[in-house]
């Protein structure tokens, strides 16, 4: 555990010279002889008059050391010269008072006491060793019943429980000496001591081998694991019962006198006093031969007092202190946010730091921050003192401090000198990702606020409405070097989560640049409107300066003449640039003076998105230094131009569209029609609600677009400030513009449901009282959401960090041949995420060729794809690419650089020791918080998305693939299944069957793909030609229809009124509707179709789910395509990350979703087999092998497959979300990984948040680190045990080498919380959650923590094994190993010489 040497363990621990930590159970001997410096016999603490500790009490100086440095209790010895002397009068050693922080004592107990952790923490360790239930043990420990320890020659059984009456009866029958039965801790101690663990282990293994029941095997395996832990460690089971209690050093449980004769004390002192009082009383009682019943009660009270000391409230009612508050026990000291681990070890307050309000510093360079002089003086004080002493200005520290307080002129000179090249760290809470702490060169400023460069605000998520930031000074040379090289703001201009620039101009800067780069404006002839020509940029700039740089739209005739003087910045001009004549504007020429030449002449308008692209392009072409200079220039230019342009918004700039009245009237008419349909009973109330909302959503979009185009139109002649702000991306968006000038639109209730009647007024017109009241609903929801969800998001980040903290880059290349396959992500025909974005920066696992040309290699196996290569692959039309991934990485610890790919923060291959796990966790957690905070910005506006029709984007041939359709009476094709799609293909003159064959084998690519829902109406026939803009299909948004595909007569089956159906009179329409209701029993509601009215020949049956409304009558004659019933879809709720965050948590915690979908277990064809116990029996039959898999599906679930449908393994059979564990079981690890990554990404994509796949992959990798043993073979592993893959393969390798049978296991999916607790490091797990359980578990099996992860090293005060500490750790490990080898060698040679 420690480096070998002559010094004692404590000294080594102090110096941190250890590389592993072992935990175990302390024996009584250890507590009494090794830890303790004396026994505490009195409950007294300090004398209330003298405030001096009482002798032999809880603060005794003789035991714990002096309260004053170098001074004994009685005052005989004072000063350091008596160091080490033990006073002959008071017995106190003369030493430093700080020993009172480390010296412990003990209390000798009158009777053995059971340690509550080992008995009450589930699973009960004592119960498992003895094979007794926790309730039986409890009765013994708390002196309610006797337990037989030695049955002797009686008919009793060992460990049998006897109550008082039974005990007396047995004593009468056999005599008191014929057997041994005891109560309390003593009994448990004797039982544990007499337990033969070796033979128990053999017996358990034998029983495990013979048992067939899965449940019993799991139980036995758990018990076996605990027993094995004791056998393999140096722990003895009887040590779980205490005879001595250790007492914590007094300075860790202080007692502080307050004014007025009262004391503030740690709760531990009260708890210790209770134990001592009861213990002393019990000792006295035992000496006096008191009646058994009193003794027993006193022993029980002592057990309870010790329980309260270790874990108050774990057994019975907690012990209360003053003010009826439960006292904080030793367990509470460790647990939770304010426990020792999280409060003092993982997060400490640091010296050399300060905080202040921040203000904007537009004059600063990118790598600078403004530091108030007073603050700098305080922070750099020791540096100043050293410099002043070196200069000879002062000779003592005291005089230097006085000089600093005086503010002498030379102090300021020294300060200026010191801060040059000494970076400081700025941090803004909450630090959600690594960009929350960055280093800057300080610039001394007057005032008291810290100045921050405007471009770093986005990374810190800072604004200047009162935000504060903390400043930290890196002290050591190494820390300063790290801050300079790795943490400077210019090195952090890209997001580690997506690789996009984070330092981009925003707000005013964007507006200024956009205005400068605006499209050319046409000036009439009378203002000299001829297009002027210039020979070069210099001439343009000269002309601009001559005219005083006119920026207003009002054009002064006097300023313009034929010589071209006083040109306008938006005027169209011709200029020769690089030998070419370009049509541009003076503004653009001026902007290009700051653009690096390598980027070429920028001749287009510059909204924020394009600026961002330009920065990325600049970094790739000219490197970091030039990019940072360019960013500073952009900032400067942006602010100057927006100030000069003086763009401000007036009320009249908000134009109300003229067609508003017309559109609203039309909408009200449509709503009236829908209402009439409802009253006539054609549609349900749910459908009416959904249709109404669809109408208003459409109106909202129409008006929004009308308003936007009106403002845009006006901008062509004169800049509309509102349009400038929105189009440039400086402030606001279309949705907010819509509320200002069109209508506020639909509002949401706090529960997410949409209020039907929209707010038709806008802010320019003003809201009515009713509208204002409806508005307040959504606004308040936004505020409440923010408060609640921020906490949720922070907790999610914490769990993610904990699960991924030890994923570091440990090697360059693991050499794996495994890969994953990625392709473009599409939604319908829309491309959501192109292939190039998914493969950029990833390692290719096999050569990629130009399609149809094997000689042209686009990328070789092992290449890390550059953006140019990724672009080429995408342009070549390649569908999917095989890439290496952290999911398939085979590194023994952490992951390798090749499987991870590029570091997105700098575009280079990731370096060794990089903490990619923590980066991944922050990348996923940070936007969660951002988005939850962002909900209220829309003021609760219902943001729903609806697309009721599909329109062809280009000309082509329409091909149905995997679609079952029926032609209705109007000649339209109605879709009967859910799995198919419409494909638009290039017209190449082939036959329809050829197209279908080529599409199904993926031999040709479709121009567009449209997945179609059940019940969609296709308006174009299969194989027909379509033109761009033609309507192809209409989608049913409000209902899931059940459509008949054959003609015939209707017959109701199992549609029994009052049992499976009910007639409901619609309150509003008065019409009676037949609805299928949820029911219990053997009924299987369905509609059968017969060929004739006599019901002789059955044509088909249709299962009707509960909640469906039946649309046909018994005996009615129907034609194909007619609606039999319809199941209304749930009312539309707004899409919001509020729904999204819990979804991410549900995925990463691997929880089973509510109303989960059933999925097919094998490939085959669907059939039904009736009903059993209120469940529908659905069978999937493999037609080749004849194999069948039965699915019992609740009648309340809605099936999305029908009889005769072909399904593939893992395909959904019912509506709902899929259970991830089922995907793992049925489809395997690869499919599950793909599912989890895509599902998490979908939540973020919906909010427009860009996170690279590799981050999600790391989290998913950590969730799949373990396997569950199904057959232990000859290994030491246990049945049902979850072990690390690494450990499993190692154990199997060892067993196979020894000629044994290897173990079998299946992969297991763990949620992130469970995975964190299952980590190898017990220190890391204990600091996360379930502290007592983790520590108990670790102590029982004497676990060793090798300090490999980050958290455990931070807790132990070591350098972390990542980043710059990665190499250091490696070197130390090698050095220690070498030292140990030398030691062994020396020992051997010594041994030989002695033997010789």
UniProtKB/Swiss-Prot annotation:
Residues that hold Zn(2+) 1 according to the record: 72, 74, 87, 90
Any one GO MF annotation of this record: zinc ion binding
Entry EC no(s): 2.7.7.6
Annotated CDD domains: RNAP_beta'_C, RNAP_beta'_N
Signal peptide positions on this chain: none
Gene Ontology BP, a term: DNA-templated transcription
Transferase listed as a keyword: yes
InterPro entries cross-referenced by the UniProt entry: DNA-dir_RpoC_beta_prime, DNA-dir_RpoC_beta_prime_bact, RNA_pol_asu, RNA_pol_N, RNA_pol_Rpb1_1, RNA_pol_Rpb1_3, RNA_pol_Rpb1_3_sf, RNA_pol_Rpb1_4
Name of the featured protein: DNA-directed RNA polymerase subunit beta'
Organism encoding this protein: Chlamydia trachomatis serovar D (strain ATCC VR-885 / DSM 19411 / UW-3/Cx)
């Amino acid at each position: 555990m420690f480096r070998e040497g002559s010094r004692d363990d404590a000294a080594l621990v102090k110096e941190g010279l250890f590389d592993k930590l072992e935990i175990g159970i302390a024996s009584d001997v250890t507590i009494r002889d090794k830890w303790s410096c004396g026994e505490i016999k009195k409950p007294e603490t300090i004398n209330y008059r003298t405030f001096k500790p009482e002798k032999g009490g809880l603060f005794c100086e003789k035991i714990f050391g002096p309260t004053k440095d170098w001074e004994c209790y009685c005052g005989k010895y004072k000063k350091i010269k008596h160091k080490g002397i033990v006073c002959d009068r008071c017995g106190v050693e003369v030493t430093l008072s700080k020993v009172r922080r480390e010296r412990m004592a003990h209390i000798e107990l009158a009777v053995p006491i059971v340690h509550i952790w080992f008995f009450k923490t589930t699973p009960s360790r004592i119960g498992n060793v003895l094979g007794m239930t926790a309730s039986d043990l409890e009765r013994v420990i708390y002196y309610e019943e006797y337990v037989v320890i030695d049955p002797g020659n009686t008919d009793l059984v060992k460990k049998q429980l006897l109550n008082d009456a039974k005990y007396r009866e047995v004593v009468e029958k056999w005599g008191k000496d014929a057997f041994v039965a005891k109560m309390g801790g003593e009994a448990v101690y004797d039982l544990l001591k007499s337990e033969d663990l070796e033979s128990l282990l053999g017996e358990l293994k034998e029983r495990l081998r013979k048992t067939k029941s899965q449940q019993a095997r799991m139980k036995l395996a758990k018990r076996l694991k605990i027993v094995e832990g004791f056998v393999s460690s140096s722990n003895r089971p009887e040590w779980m019962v205490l005879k001595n209690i250790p007492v914590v050093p007094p300075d860790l449980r202080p007692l502080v006198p307050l004014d007025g004769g009262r004391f503030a004390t740690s709760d531990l002192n009260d708890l210790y006093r209770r134990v001592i009082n009861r213990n002393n009383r019990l000792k006295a009682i035992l000496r006096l031969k008191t009646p058994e019943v009193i003794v027993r009660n006193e022993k029980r009270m002592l057990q309870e007092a010790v329980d309260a000391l270790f874990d108050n409230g774990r057994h019975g009612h907690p012990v209360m202190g003053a003010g009826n508050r439960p006292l904080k026990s030793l367990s509470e000291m460790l647990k939770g946010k304010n426990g020792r681990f999280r409060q003092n070890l993982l997060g400490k307050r640091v010296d050399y730091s300060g905080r202040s309000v921040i203000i904007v510093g537009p004059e600063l360079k990118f790598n600078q921050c403004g530091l108030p002089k007073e603050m700098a003086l305080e922070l750099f004080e020791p540096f100043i003192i050293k410099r002043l002493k070196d200069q000879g200005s002062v000779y003592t520290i005291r005089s230097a401090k006085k000089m600093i307080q005086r503010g002498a002129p030379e102090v300021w000179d020294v300060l200026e000198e010191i801060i040059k090249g000494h970076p400081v760290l700025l941090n803004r809470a909450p630090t959600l990702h690594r960009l929350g702490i960055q280093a800057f060169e300080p610039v001394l400023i007057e005032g008291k606020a810290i100045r921050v460069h405007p471009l770093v605000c986005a990374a810190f998520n800072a604004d200047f409405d009162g935000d504060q930031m903390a400043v930290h000074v890196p002290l050591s040379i190494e820390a300063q070097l790290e801050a300079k090289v790795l943490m400077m703001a210019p090195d952090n201009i890209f997001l580690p989560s997506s690789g996009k620039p984070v330092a981009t101009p925003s707000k005013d800067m964007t507006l200024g640049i956009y205005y400068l780069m605006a499209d050319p404006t046409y000036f009439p002839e009378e203002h000299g409107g001829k297009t002027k020509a210039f020979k070069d940029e210099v001439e343009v700039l000269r002309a601009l300066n001559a005219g005083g740089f006119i920026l207003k739209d009002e054009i002064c005739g006097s300023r313009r003449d034929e010589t071209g003087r006083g040109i306008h910045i938006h005027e169209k001009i011709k200029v020769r640039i690089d030998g070419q004549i370009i049509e541009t504007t003076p503004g653009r020429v001026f902007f290009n003076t700051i653009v690096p030449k390598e980027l070429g002449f920028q001749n287009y308008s510059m909204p924020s998105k394009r600026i961002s692209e330009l920065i990325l392009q600049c970094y790739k072409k000219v490197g970091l230094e030039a990019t940072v200079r360019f960013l500073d220039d952009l900032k400067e230019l942006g602010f100057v131009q927006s100030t000069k342009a003086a763009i401000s918004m007036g009320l009249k700039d908000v134009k109300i569209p003229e067609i508003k009245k017309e559109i609203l009237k039309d909408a009200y008419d449509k709503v009236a029609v829908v209402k009439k349909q409802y009253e006539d009973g054609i549609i349900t109330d749910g459908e009416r609600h959904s249709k109404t909302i669809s109408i208003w959503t459409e109106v909202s979009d129409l008006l929004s677009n009308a308003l936007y185009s009106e403002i845009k139109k006006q901008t062509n002649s004169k800049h509309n400030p509102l349009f400038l702000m929105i189009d440039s991306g400086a402030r606001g968006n279309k949705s907010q513009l819509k509320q200002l000038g069109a209508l506020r639109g639909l509002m949401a209730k706090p529960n997410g449901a949409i209020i039907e009647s929209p707010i038709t007024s806008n802010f320019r017109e003003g809201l009515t009282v009713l509208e204002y009241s409806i508005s307040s609903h959504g606004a308040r929801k936004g505020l409440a959401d923010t408060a609640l969800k921020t906490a949720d998001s922070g907790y999610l980040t914490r769990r993610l960090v904990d699960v991924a903290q030890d994923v570091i880059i440990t090697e360059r290349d693991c050499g794996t041949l495994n890969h994953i396959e990625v392709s473009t992500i599409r939604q319908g025909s829309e491309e959501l995420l192109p292939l190039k974005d998914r493969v950029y920066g990833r390692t290719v696992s096999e050569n990629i060729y130009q399609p149809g040309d094997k000689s042209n290699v686009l990328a070789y196996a092992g290449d890390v794809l550059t953006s140019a290569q990724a672009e080429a692959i995408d342009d070549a039309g390649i569908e999917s690419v095989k890439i290496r991934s952290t999911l398939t990485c085979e590194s023994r610890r952490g992951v390798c650089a090749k499987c991870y790919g590029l570091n997105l923060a700098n575009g280079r291959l990731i370096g060794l020791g990089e903490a990619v796990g923590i980066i991944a966790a922050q990348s996923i957690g940070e936007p969660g918080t951002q988005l939850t905070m962002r909900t209220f910005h829309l003021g609760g506006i219902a943001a729903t998305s609806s697309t009721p029709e599909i329109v062809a984007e280009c000309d082509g041939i329409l091909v149905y693939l995997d679609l079952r359709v029926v032609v209705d009476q109007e000649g339209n094709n109605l879709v009967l299944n859910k799995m198919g799609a419409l494909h638009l293909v290039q017209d190449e003159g082939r036959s329809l069957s050829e197209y279908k064959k080529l599409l199904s084998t993926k031999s040709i690519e479709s121009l567009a793909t449209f997945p179609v829902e059940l019940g969609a109406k296709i308006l174009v026939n299969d194989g027909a030609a379509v033109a761009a803009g033609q309507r192809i299909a209409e989608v049913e948004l409000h209902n899931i229809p059940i459509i008949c595909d054959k003609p015939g007569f209707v017959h109701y089956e199992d549609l029994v009124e009052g049992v499976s159906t009910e007639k409901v009179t619609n309150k509003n329409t008065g019409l009676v509707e037949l609805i299928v209701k949820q029911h219990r029993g053997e009924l299987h509601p369905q509609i059968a179709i017969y060929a004739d009215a006599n019901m002789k020949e059955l044509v088909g049956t249709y299962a009707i789910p509960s909640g469906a409304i039946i649309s046909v009558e018994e005996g009615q004659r129907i034609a194909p395509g007619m609606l039999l019933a319809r199941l209304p879809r749930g009312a539309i709720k707004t899409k919001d990350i509020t729904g999204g965050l819990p979804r991410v948590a549900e995925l990463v915690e691997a929880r089973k979703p509510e109303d989960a979908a059933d999925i097919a277990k094998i490939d085959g064809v669907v059939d039904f087999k009736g009903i059993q116990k209120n469940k529908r029996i659905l069978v999937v039959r493999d037609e080749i092998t004849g194999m069948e898999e039965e699915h019992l599906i609740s009648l309340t679930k809605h099936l999305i497959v029908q009889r005769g449908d072909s399904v593939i393994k893992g395909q959904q059979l019912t509506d709902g979300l899929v259970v991830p564990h089922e995907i793992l079981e049925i489809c395997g690890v690869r499919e599950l990984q793909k599912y989890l990554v895509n599902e998490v990404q979908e939540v973020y994509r919906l909010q427009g948040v860009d996170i690279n796949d590799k981050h999600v992959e790391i989290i998913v990798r950590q969730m799949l680190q373990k396997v569950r043993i199904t057959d232990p073979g000859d290994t030491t592993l246990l049945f049902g045990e979850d072990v690390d893959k690494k450990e499993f393969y190692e154990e199997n390798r060892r067993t196979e080498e020894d000629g044994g049978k290897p173990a079998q296991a299946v992969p297991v999916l763990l949620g992130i919380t469970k995975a964190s607790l299952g980590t190898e490091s017990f220190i890391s797990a204990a600091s996360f959650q379930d502290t007592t359980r983790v520590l108990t578990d670790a102590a029982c099996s004497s676990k060793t923590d090798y300090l490999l992860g980050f958290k455990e090293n931070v807790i132990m005060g070591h350098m972390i094994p990542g980043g710059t500490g990665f190499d250091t750790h490696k070197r130390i490990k090698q050095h220690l190993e070498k030292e140990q080898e030398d030691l062994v060698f020396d020992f051997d040679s010594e041994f030989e010489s002695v033997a010789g």
